[in-house]
Regions:
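Long, contiguous binding/interaction regions
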Residues: 12-20
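N-terminal intrinsically disordered, cationic/polar leader segments
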Residues: 2-11, 27-30, 37-68
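Compact soluble domain cores
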Residues: 20-27
Length: 68
């Protein structure tokens, strides 16, 4: 195993997930606000599941998205 390759890879993956998921959430909130589906002061439960089948890893992370 190449430690440098591994370390770079495990840093890149969460960064990509973070940036992409933030963009998706921002678009969903803007669409919901524009259509009047939400007021803009809500709190939404949110979860993300990390699956790495080759390592038999499945971890769920839970939190909330607060608009105000």
């Amino acid at each position: 195993m190449n430690e440098d390759t591994f370390n770079i890879s495990i840093r890149k993956f969460p960064k990509m997930v973070g940036v992409s998921s933030q963009r998706e959430i921002e678009h969903a909130v803007e669409k919901a606000r524009s259509s009047g589906a939400i007021r803009g002061n809500e709190k939404f439960p949110a979860s993300v599941t990390l699956d790495v089948p080759g390592l038999k890893l499945s971890v769920k992370f839970e939190g909330k998205i607060e608009l105000e």
